[in-house]
């Protein structure tokens, strides 16, 4: 197979996934934007977390809110729970990898904050544990998933499920949805 043909196939797959994602996530997206705006207006914060590529998305989206997305404005309170290697490794060593995010939510989360777990499968144990702790503490426990939503269904609300079984396509939609989230939160919570 020629490389260009392969690239064309990847772009076509992306376009197919893009075509069905909007309708699938529209309603929970609106609720998530509102939850984030309400939390920030009340002095709360948004906590992002995930593993691997989803950890990178968590960092990326938190940075967009703290620094800027489209324009210079006041900083918005957001944090990626994927960046503190001392905390992550101490927790994994002393407790378990399953608790690396939930311990941070226990320490940093407050009722009314928004916790956003990102996992393409919807079933990453440490993300699920963190969402359960967040929900029990009175945070909005939201999620980005793919496939059929996995074990996040019934736990995360709002839950934005990308209707694809291909990890790369799910990740591409997650960052698109995340950018749209940052755009709308920035526009409402910190208008120019």
Swiss-Prot record:
UniProt KW RNA-binding keyword: no
GO terms under biological process: carbohydrate metabolic process; D-glycero-D-manno-heptose 7-phosphate biosynthetic process
Cofactor(s) listed: Zn(2+)
Keyword annotations: Carbohydrate metabolism, Cytoplasm, Isomerase, Metal-binding, Zinc
Sequence positions that bind substrate: 51-53, 64, 93-94, 119-121, 124, 171
Name of one Pfam family that matches: SIS_2
Entry's EC annotation: 5.3.1.28
Cofactor binding, note field: Binds 1 zinc ion per subunit.
Catalytic activity line of the entry: 2 D-sedoheptulose 7-phosphate = D-glycero-alpha-D-manno-heptose 7-phosphate + D-glycero-beta-D-manno-heptose 7-phosphate
Cellular localization per UniProt: Cytoplasm
Residues annotated as domain SIS: 36-192
InterPro entries membership: GmhA/DiaA (IPR035461), Phosphoheptose_Isoase (IPR004515), SIS_dom (IPR001347), SIS_dom_sf (IPR046348), SIS_GmhA/DiaA_subfam (IPR050099)
Binding sites annotated in the UniProt record for Zn(2+): 60, 64, 171, 179
Function: Catalyzes the isomerization of sedoheptulose 7-phosphate in D-glycero-D-manno-heptose 7-phosphate.
Subunit and interaction comment: Homotetramer.
Family affiliation: Belongs to the SIS family. GmhA subfamily.
Additional comment: The reaction produces a racemic mixture of D-glycero-alpha-D-manno-heptose 7-phosphate and D-glycero-beta-D-manno-heptose 7-phosphate.
Protein name per UniProt: Phosphoheptose isomerase
Organism of derivation: Paramagnetospirillum magneticum (strain ATCC 700264 / AMB-1)
Organism ancestry: Bacteria, Pseudomonadati, Pseudomonadota, Alphaproteobacteria, Rhodospirillales
Annotated gene: gmhA
